[in-house]
Amino acid sequence: YNAISAILRGYGDSRRPMYFVAMSCLLNIAGDIIFVKYLGLGVAGTALATVLSQSISMICSIVYLNRKKFIFTFTLKNLRIDRDRLKELAMVGIPISSQECMVRLSFLYLTSVTNRLGVNAAAAVGIASKYDVFAMLPATSIASALAAITAQNYGAGKPERARRSLTAGIGFAVLASSVFFLWAQLSPQTMIGLFNTNPDIIEAGIPFFQSCSFDYLAVSFVFCLNGFMNGRSKTVFTMVSCCFGALALRMPLIWLAYTYCPDNLFVIGLIAPAVSGFMAVYTMLFVIRQLRQDNSGRRKELTLRSV
């Protein structure tokens, strides 16, 4: 299901994966209604609806691509493990998976810490985490697109297009995330009020929203830069960077803030953007260094050709 969408995106087609995912979502909703509401299957019905919807979407996508004569044919005979390709995928995929795990781990630690600060603080941080998903969605999506675009253009010998895509991607991600950032700065109480109207929770959450919302802008740089580096197969760097940010910076700083400023949610919320900003700076420096090496290598190649 996800592999077919990834293949299509790598091929430069992001529209058809969207159609397949939309089909899965609609089938999932219909399945939830049928299995839970009418058949009374409860949680098992929800799980069944998810599995069936994704399976049907996968089968339909395979049939569609085979009929459209895609670049290769999906058959049972072709579904086998190629050791060389598996090694290449593992070298790229495992570091990317590891960096995602580290990011989730640091957010889980933040949740566990804020749960000890009382009901109001825990509720406010929980509401903020819901907005985080939507506020960071543009950066996450653009980072995935940048990885594919960068790989395609470097493979085609057009690095300049990849660099322009990076600049455009960062600009678009920052612009899209700015909507949530400005909302959190100008009217955080309305953001919290959409989920909970308790005045104590709103009061506790306002300083946290105003500080943590800076992370929406910072991660736009980090995610896009990491996507660019992933497209160049520099996945080990992005993995080490994310592990360092989560284990050496974010989690220890959260512990320090909890230990010495337990009642100050503004300080706790400021940790994420501070760490992301620092990561953005050294990642940007690494990218600039890589680009300079590319230019130097290209100049040497042109010099050798002219001799």
Regions found by a protein language model. Name each.
Residues 24, 53-57, 61, 65, ...:
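Transmembrane helical elements of multi-pass membrane transporters/channels
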Residues 34-41, 101-129, 134, 152-153, ...:
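Helix-terminus/linker motif at the lipid-water interface of multi-pass membrane proteins
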